Amino acid sequence: MVSIRPDEISAILKQQIEDYDKSVSVSNVGSVLQVGDGIARVYGLQQVMAGELVEFEDGTEGIALNLEDDNVGAVLMGEGLGIQEGSTVRATGKIASVPVGDGLLGRVVNPLGVALDGKGDLGTTESRLIESPAPGIIQRKSVHEPMQTGITAIDAMIPIGRGQRELIIGDRQTGKTAIAIDTILNQKDQDVVCVYVAIGQKAASVAQVTEVLRERGALDYTVIVAANASDPAALQYLAPYTGASIAEYFMYKGKATLVIYDDLSKQAQAYRQMSLLLRRPPGREAYPGDVFYCHSRLLERAAKLSDAMGKGSMTALPIIETQAGDVSAYIPTNVISITDGQVFLSSDLFNSGLRPAINVGISVSRVGGAAQTKAIKKIAGTLKLELAQFDELAAFSQFASDLDAATQKQLGRGKRLRELLKQPQFSPLILAEQVAIVYAGVKGLIDDVPVDQVVQFSRELREYLKSNKPEFIEKIQTEKVLSPEAETMLKEAVAEVTSTMLATAN
């Protein structure tokens, strides 16, 4: 007969009582009613928030966007091939966030902060919400520091300041991305963190940009956020906000940052696709009613912070692609009204051989003038006017048989200025070189140089200054002012180069 030992039974009961785990997990769950085209309709999820992350049975993540009477409309941030009707969906209680920190520099990530470059873990410990409020009025300061692009035409006539939003707009294949990449390359040794956001682009194009930045040593201070053409619409829609969050981290640490959104037309299309599939009412050009807010809340995050906030800045260069030069379409007009100016690229100028193909007449920088360095501001004042007058005269002179000497001189000056502003891709110029080139053109010091040799003159003048007058370059780079002493040095250099060129030509 088995003897029952009460002490043993009581010991076991005590042990079980002590080990009893009282924690209760409450999860908000629902089930899939319908799925397809990157959208899922979910029944249940009673307590879900707008914009909350939800997790499907197969591990795919989504965002709850439409909260309706009897269902929730969620967009999928993955393929979602394993999601079926009746699959369970769990609300996570979290809003989409992205890892931030120095570990992101030199890396390629997707809009959720997942590395795409095969270099392993990002090594970051902090994260930021993808959607963050823009800095308030008191936290801001007016734009007053220059953001040099290295492109003479922009730095002289359409200057950009730190904390500004400057739109780059033009048809496809007019060099919009090239201007953005040149600007990143020009930030070398300037202690500026750059974020390049590729939205809906070919994976090959993103790889090419990454390679260009790596070859020229610019990837060390750049983060690339890529939502390729093959990615779901939800990721293409989120990509710019991710880029802004990464830049904000550095901005609030007191650093200057530069963000390029390439391009917001594709983000608007992705948002339109999501909205129409969620059965939201369409507006003009079938875009949803809040597409303006979609872009304004993104671009308002760019700012120059006050001294109390650490003096950081975020400069935004959004890119918009137009169709046949139509800047009066819905998305272009929206973004033009949000930004502080635009650089308009013309396909006609591009095809005529003018690179960068900037149409100076309708390009403008509304706040950059306050940030422009004194050296180039002093000499570039008349440049924009002279080029605008030249364009007008050139159109008129096609119909005139004989022109007076003054008109011929003005046409000749305009042609030479046009040639001076030509610049090959991936070769940004430092401030001193820009000052030298613009000075020579505006002051009429190269009126005797044949038009077809102006590009050569520009190259030789830069080489001459580097080898024979390094003190001029040093003076301009440090003082940022064209002093009488520096002006004398520059005049001597221009005279020397032009006389040598004319002598060899003869």
Swiss-Prot record:
This is ATP synthase subunit alpha. HAMAP family: ATP_synth_alpha_bact (MF_01346). Keywords: ATP synthesis, ATP-binding, CF(1), Hydrogen ion transport, Ion transport, Membrane, Nucleotide-binding, Thylakoid, Translocase, Transport. One of its GO terms (molecular function) is ATP binding. The lineage of its organism: Bacteria, Bacillati, Cyanobacteriota, Cyanophyceae, Synechococcales. The record marks S363 as: Required for activity. It is an enzyme of class 7 (translocase). PANTHER family: ATP SYNTHASE SUBUNIT ALPHA, MITOCHONDRIAL. GO terms for cellular component: plasma membrane-derived thylakoid membrane; proton-transporting ATP synthase complex. ATP binds at G170, D171, R172, Q173, T174, G175, K176, T177. It catalyses: ATP + H2O + 4 H(+)(in) = ADP + phosphate + 5 H(+)(out). It is found in: Cellular thylakoid membrane. Produces ATP from ADP in the presence of a proton gradient across the membrane. The alpha chain is a regulatory subunit. It comes from the Bacteria. Belongs to the ATPase alpha/beta chains family. F-type ATPases have 2 components, CF(1) - the catalytic core - and CF(0) - the membrane proton channel. CF(1) has five subunits: alpha(3), beta(3), gamma(1), delta(1), epsilon(1). CF(0) has four main subunits: a(1), b(1), b'(1) and c(9-12). It is a peripheral membrane protein. Its EC number is 7.1.2.2. InterPro entries: ATP_synth_asu-like_sf, ATP_synth_asu_C, ATP_synth_asu_C_sf, ATP_synth_F1_a_nt-bd_dom, ATP_synth_F1_asu, ATPase_a/bsu_AS, ATPase_F1/V1/A1_a/bsu_N, ATPase_F1/V1/A1_a/bsu_N_sf. Pfam families: ATP-synt_ab (PF00006), ATP-synt_ab_C (PF00306), ATP-synt_ab_N (PF02874).
